[in-house]
Amino acid sequence: MPGGANGTPFFLATGNLNVSLYNVVGSELLWVDGPISLQSEAMVTMCDFQGQSCALPGVYAQAGWFLTGEHRPYDRKQGTIDRVIPKENFGYNAAGGSGAWEVATRFSWLDLSDHDIKGGQLTDWTAGINWYWNPYTKLVFNYVHSMANVSGSPQSQTDMFGLRAQVDF
């Protein structure tokens, strides 16, 4: 089955589900203490599929540490994480600094199988380095180890390396 824009297959897929009712419930936690942050989210989609009540849960937990001393800003009134502001912006000239460097790790798990829904289970472990050049630009380097278990298929594993450049304005 084709996946994203480049045609790579999805690890998990339920196909189109004809459900009569569904609800999504989730909770998110964030803790920040100086350069260290912990974040987690859990969600479950509950649905009525072919007369059966089904639950499709997912969860992630991640930790990050800014090697250069920055912190992850949090706006309590809005309940949002704001952009990271490096102590020194990255620059090629003598006035430029090294930007902000963060090491991070993440665990995620998704279960798309319940009763007659056979979408499979996926577990990911991620290690990454985030390099914030300035408040609007960052590079993300990730290594991801994924383990998929889909009914009727042998368990599969894959290792991925990713690089993403992000500009936020």
Q: Language-model segments: what does each one mean?
A:
Residues 1-169:
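Outer-membrane beta-barrel pore domains
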